[in-house]
């Protein structure tokens, strides 16, 4: 009866009850706070919600409690309709994807160079380890390394504008999301990641 009131990205309270625990029961769903209703005419933020819901639906393990990640996701969802800057919301979304990767056991470390331990002049990310690499240690592997955006702790490259930086962030997290999904031998990553790829392409 209340299906029309609830949209993807909304915060709801869900309870399940049954006369006997091993029999079929029913769910009671109450809307706590809407997100989509506040951004209905904002295409990029609707794309963010679509990607958010898509990734959580097939990446997070079923029936596993994720209290800390839930709180981070809740905080992010609340930010979507109130933050005046689309670019800032997109950056927050990329941080959320990093939290998602961490939640499923694929943490990325941008705090120091994986070769030297230096915390300065970080420019790349190793596609193998997910760790940052300093600009002086790329060597002959430079073309194989991923770019570390400025807003994620990378060096501020001359003539690199904010949109380029955000797109590099999208490319970085998408690489590791695909790498994680490859471990499960999904046959059609493009279909599974349709909403996520659409978000990145529409921003581009």
What are these regions (language model features)?
Residues 1-204:
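Non-catalytic alpha-helical scaffolds and adjoining flexible linkers that form interface surfaces
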């Amino acid at each position: 009866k209340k299906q029309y009131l609830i949209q993807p990205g909304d915060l709801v309270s869900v309870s399940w009850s049954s006369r006997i625990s091993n029999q079929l029961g029913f769910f009671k769903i109450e809307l706590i706070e809407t997100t989509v209703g506040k951004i209905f005419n904002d295409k990029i933020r609707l794309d963010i919600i679509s990607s958010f819901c898509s990734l959580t639906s097939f990446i997070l393990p079923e029936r596993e409690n994720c209290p800390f990640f839930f709180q981070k996701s809740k905080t992010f969802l609340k930010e979507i309709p109130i933050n005046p800057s689309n670019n800032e919301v997109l950056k927050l979304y990329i941080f959320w994807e990093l939290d998602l990767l961490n939640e499923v056991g694929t943490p990325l470390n941008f705090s120091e160079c994986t070769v030297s331990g230096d915390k300065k002049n970080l420019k790349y990310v190793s596609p193998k380890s997910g760790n940052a690499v300093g600009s002086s240690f790329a060597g002959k592997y430079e073309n194989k390394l991923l770019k570390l955006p400025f807003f994620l702790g990378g060096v501020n490259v001359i003539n690199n504008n904010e949109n380029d930086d955000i797109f590099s962030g999208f490319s970085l997290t998408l690489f590791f999301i695909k790498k994680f999904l490859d471990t499960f031998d999904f046959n059609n990553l493009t279909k599974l990641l349709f909403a996520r790829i659409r978000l990145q392409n529409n921003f581009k």
